[in-house]
Amino acid sequence: DVYKRQGLSAIPNSELPPEKAFKAETGGASGSLFSILIGAIDKGIENSSNFGEFLTNASNRISLIGEAKEGDKTMLDALIPAAKASLNNPKNSLEEASLAAREGAKKTVTMPAKKGRAKYVENAGIGHMDPGAFSTSEIISFVCNYIRIENEKAL
């Protein structure tokens, strides 16, 4: 089961906060970094008016821990643009965050990897989308859509 391998199945059935349940199941460097994102998103779901702030806090923590920045061909190439877009357009923050994350992930195709395993492969991964950026954009897109649907139900 793909969800079990990714640690996602641990979240709904755990007494732990989502980020801790995910980290406990996945481990590794990417598990730690994605657990930060999941924690920020959990807070963002509870308070969608500050979604951009939660994404910004997550990107700052991930950048510090991973010693990476936007342009290094990492998950930050989707996360940072999403956070900025959400903050810059509060009225449409969810839609803007989702679009910016997807665009940021697409841009990694032409970037040489400066961090992670991809920096060791031929051409530093140029020509391929960064998997962390892609995963981040998919997570953000899914969550933004979920929040939008829940907000519509509440009306």
PLM regions: where:
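N-terminal loops that bind phosphate or other acidic moieties
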Residues: 1-155
